[in-house]
Amino acid sequence: MSPSDVPINWKRNLTVTWLGCFLTGAAFSLVMPFLPLYVEQLGVTGHSALNMWSGLVFSITFLFSAIASPFWGGLADRKGRKIMLLRSALGMAIVMLLMGMAQNIWQFLILRALLGLLGGFIPNANALIATQVPRHKSGWALGTLSTGGVSGALLGPLAGGLLADHYGLRPVFFITASVLFICFLLTFFFIRENFLPVSKKEMLHVREVVASLKNPRLVLSLFVTTLIIQVATGSIAPILTLYVRELAGDVSNIAFISGMIASVPGVAALLSAPRLGKLGDRIGPEKILIVALIISVLLLIPMSFVQTPWQLALLRFLLGAADGALLPAVQTLLVYNSTNQIAGRIFSYNQSFRDIGNVTGPLMGAAISASYGFRAVFCVTAGVVLFNAIYSWNSLRRRRLAIE
C-alpha cells in the first residue's frame, strides 16, 4: 500500500490542529497587552510618537500577512498543507525569539512584518481539515477548529500580562517562541496527510482557479463577508475601553471591566461555533450566515444607546454568539464551492481579505469616533454589516436561481 492510500484519521488531525490553533492564537495574543510598553522600552518617547509606532507595529503584521497569504496558499496546493503548517510554526517561533532580542524600534518593526510574512498556521489548518473531513461534517469540524484560535486568543492576553508582570517584557517573547516550537513538534509528529506533490507546470493559474469554482461570484461575496466581519470587529476595538469608561464613570477597576467586556464575545463564540456549525450541516450554512448577519445588525444598533457597562456586556455576549457562526459558515460555503486541488489558495485568499479587514477596521473606528463620537461607531458598523447581509443574501439567491 502506497503512502497516499493509507487512510487518514481526520478526527485525530482535527484534535491536533485544534491544539495547534490554540497555541498559535495564544502565542500571538500573549504579547498584545504590553506591545505599546515594549515599543516604549525600545526608545520611543512622546504620546503621539508612541501611538503612531504602536499602531504601525500592530497593523504591519496583518498587512504583510495579506500580501503573503496567496503565495503560501499556492505552495500548499503544490507541496501539501502539513509542510506549510511546519513552515509557519517554526518560522514564527524563530521570529518571536528574535523579537525578544530587538534593540531598537526599526528592528522590531521589521520583525513584526516578517511575522506576517511567515504566518498562516490557522488558514492552512482550515484548508487541511476542509480537504479531509467528510463534506456533511464540514460545518461542525470548521466550527470546532475555529474555537481553538479563539480560546487561545482569549487566554493569551491574561497569561501575557501575568508573565510580563513577573518576568519582564523580553522573556515573554522567548516563552512565546517556545509555545510556537511546541506547536511545530505536535504538527511534525502527529498530523498525517496523504498528498501527492503537484509540479509547477500542472498547477492551475489564477484564471483557471476562478474558472474551476462552482460559483465565482458567490466565492467573491464570501471573501467580502470575511473582510466586513473583521472590519466590524476591529472598528469597535480602539474605542471600547474609552466607551466603557464613559459608561462606568469614575471607578477604580476600569481595566478589569473593559477586559471582561472585550473578552465576552470570544467566550460566547467558543460556546456557539461548534453547535451552530453542526446546525449548519443540517439546515445549510447559507441560512446560518444570513440569520447571524441580521442578528448582528440588531445587536449593534442598541449598543449605541446603552447606559451601563453591563448592558454593553450582555449585548456583546449575544453578538459573540452570532459571530461564532459567521466565519465557520463562510469557510463551509468555500469548501462546498471549491475543490481540494485549490483549497489552499481559496483559504489563503480568504485570509488576505481577513487581514485587510483587521487593518482597516480599527482605522475606520478611530476615524468615526474622532469625528462623531463613540456611539456613532456602532451605528456605522451596523450599516456596514447590513449592507453585507443584503449583498450575501443576493449572491446566495442568484446561486439558488442558477441551480434551479
From Swiss-Prot:
Keywords: Cell inner membrane, Cell membrane, Membrane, Transmembrane, Transmembrane helix, Transport. It is a multi-pass membrane protein. The chain crosses the membrane at residues 19-39, 56-76, 90-110, 113-133, 144-164, 171-191, 222-242, 254-274, 288-308, 317-337, 376-396. PROSITE patterns: MFS. InterPro entries: MFS, MFS_dom, MFS_MdtG_subfamily, MFS_sugar_transport-like, MFS_trans_sf, Mutidrug-R_MdtG, Tet-R_TetA/multi-R_MdtG-like. GO terms for molecular function: transmembrane transporter activity. CDD domains: MFS_MdtG_MDR_like. GO terms for cellular component: plasma membrane. It is found in: Cell inner membrane. Belongs to the major facilitator superfamily. DHA1 family. MdtG (TC 2.A.1.2.20) subfamily. This is Multidrug resistance protein MdtG. The gene is mdtG.
